[in-house]
């Protein structure tokens, strides 16, 4: 994606056309070195918690919910990558317990200086024909990497949900992921429930550019070591910037007075989401997802008794 690229929030569609007709000149771009590392634990694997821990904006929440609903029919999980795939990832069974460690490394932030770009490059008067129904344009890009390590296990005769959840939390806490450290992880404080009883599995979510720079992990400890390498791997991607991990979308209504358009009526100038309403929809979606998993468990149990 590029600064100035047009976006239709109703369809989650990026248009190839640029707000200002051509690439934003360097003089109109401000680059900030904002290196920062943050760590989060997602305890219950709900959409609501994932959205909150990844700081997803309300409008984007609405778009993602719509895409997830449509994907039940038209797309598979393999169509998603990185933390987008993580958000979409849901278990088939209510008996599967998941806890995730989210590592976010910010490197640089690029943003359009609107006053400068307006003076240097006039907006494209025909943009509404090239990018119909656009609602936003990309005004800022955050670079870096988001890596997510998920541990999961299923409730069985030997371990109930509470004991498994406690064991997975302790396992993640014991891993002590510290990016940049060369020390091996000390597993002496791992929970005493055996991996055989727990049958702990892992899944790693990260942009494909980083997978190509290192061997893919085969177990939890290798996944942790991979996460520890992320700062050094970021330095090898896009001249140290990493990948695009988030965008700041500027609504067209915010800069309407600057636009030189032949027919501004073809563009959507008003926000599409109410934060409270979207929050309630996310909760309902989580409840429906949980009910679907419980129903699937009942169906599987019934088939197993036939």
Q: For each predicted feature, which ranges?
A:
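Membrane-permeabilization and membrane-interfacing ectodomains
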Residues: 1-305
């Amino acid at each position: 994606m590029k600064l100035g690229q047009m976006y239709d929030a109703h369809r989650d569609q990026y248009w190839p056309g640029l707000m200002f007709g051509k690439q934003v000149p360097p003089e109109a771009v401000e680059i900030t070195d904002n290196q920062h590392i943050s760590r989060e634990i997602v305890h219950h694997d709900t959409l609501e918690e994932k959205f909150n821990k990844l700081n997803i904006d309300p409008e984007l929440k609405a778009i993602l919910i719509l895409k997830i609903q449509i994907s039940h029919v038209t797309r598979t999980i393999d169509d998603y990558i990185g933390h987008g795939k993580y958000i979409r990832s849901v278990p088939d069974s209510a008996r599967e317990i998941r806890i995730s460690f989210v590592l976010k490394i910010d490197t640089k932030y690029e943003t359009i200086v609107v006053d400068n770009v307006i003076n240097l490059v006039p907006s494209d008067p025909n943009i509404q024909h090239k990018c119909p129904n656009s609602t936003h344009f990309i005004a800022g890009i955050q670079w870096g990497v988001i890596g997510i390590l998920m541990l999961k296990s299923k409730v069985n005769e030997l371990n109930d949900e509470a004991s498994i959840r406690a064991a997975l939390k302790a396992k993640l806490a014991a891993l002590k992921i510290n990016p940049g450290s060369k020390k091996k992880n000390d597993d002496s404080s791992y929970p005493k429930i055996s991996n055989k009883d727990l049958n702990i599995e892992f899944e790693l979510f990260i942009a494909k550019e980083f997978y190509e720079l290192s061997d893919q992990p085969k177990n939890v400890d290798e996944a942790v070591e991979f996460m520890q390498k992320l700062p050094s791997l970021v330095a090898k991607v896009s001249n140290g910037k990493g990948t695009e991990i988030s965008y700041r979308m500027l609504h067209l209504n915010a800069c309407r007075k600057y636009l030189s358009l032949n027919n501004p009526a073809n563009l959507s100038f008003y926000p599409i989401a109410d934060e409270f309403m979207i929050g309630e929809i996310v909760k309902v979606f989580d409840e429906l997802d949980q009910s679907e998993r419980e129903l699937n468990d009942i169906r599987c149990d019934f088939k197993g008794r036939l």
